[in-house]
Amino acid sequence: MAIKKFKPTSPGRRQMTVSTFAEITATEPYKPLVEPLKKTGGRNNQGRLTVRHRGGGHKRLYRVIDFKRDKDGIPGRVATIEYDPNRSANIALINYADGEKRYILAPENLQVGDQVISGPEADIKVGNALPLSQIPVGTMVHNVELKPGKGGQMARSAGAGAQLMAKEGGYALLRLPSGEVRKVQESCRATVGQVGNLDWENINIGKAGRKRWLGIRPTVRGVVMNPVDHPHGGGEGRAPVGRKHPVTPWGKPAMGAKTRKKRKLSDKLIVKPRNK
């Protein structure tokens, strides 16, 4: 993925960067694998706001992605590499030998015409999915399952990849993108390679309106609100927070306070916590 810069013809364009989409080979998705996607505006089924800063944005269609990669022993060929508005990674349409078509996350260096296959007997090749027990130590993987057969849940965003560090006692040790080292059952599946679209992290949004196209609304600081709206609000002029530690709009500790549940069952599987 290459990045395009603009001449500073306006304040919004001055720092803006966009992808050239050079690797995209199709402009329209494969209709049978597309579903309607209803916008929530951050509201739940009671109409109450549960996630702030959501709303608006361009209309999207959901592409059904095969995270399970459970079509064993049947080779498939990459038909297209496509843009997906619902994630940072690109997706690849796979034509399988039995006639079925599925979308998968497009790994780095996967090209149209390449062959991919799933199953314990698959080769160690970019785009192939197999159990961690069959993958050599040191390999970069993505779309990693947490429970066998549930489908990939870890290392799915653009540029993400987990490194297989070791195998012992029925578990594989993975170093995740966050720096966390974690045990995962050897029977869990992963896809070989790193997720593509590596330059995603270097994209500069450039202007507020582009955030609105993505369905992200403005974030207002609590310190500029009124006391009725936020614990940091109120005061004459530019007043400080006025507390020992910053808090959320609901009075819970914010900015650095740990939010992970204590004595969580998965704690015993985490060998080294994520980087601060």
Swiss-Prot record:
Q: Name one GO cellular component term.
A: large ribosomal subunit
Q: Which GO terms describe its biological process?
A: cytoplasmic translation
The domain of life is Bacteria
Q: Where is the composition biased (Basic residues)?
A: 258-276
Does the record carry Ribosomal protein as a key word?
yes
Q: Which UniProt keywords apply?
A: Ribonucleoprotein, Ribosomal protein, RNA-binding, rRNA-binding
* Any one Gene Ontology molecular-function term assigned to this protein's record: structural constituent of ribosome
PANTHER family for the chain: LARGE RIBOSOMAL SUBUNIT PROTEIN UL2M (PTHR13691:SF5), RIBOSOMAL PROTEIN L2 (PTHR13691)
Q: Which family does it belong to?
A: Belongs to the universal ribosomal protein uL2 family.
Query: Any idea what job this protein has?
Result: One of the primary rRNA binding proteins. Required for association of the 30S and 50S subunits to form the 70S ribosome, for tRNA binding and peptide bond formation. It has been suggested to have peptidyltransferase activity; this is somewhat controversial. Makes several contacts with the 16S rRNA in the 70S ribosome.
Question: What is the name of the protein in this document?
Answer: Large ribosomal subunit protein uL2
Q: Which gene encodes it?
A: rplB
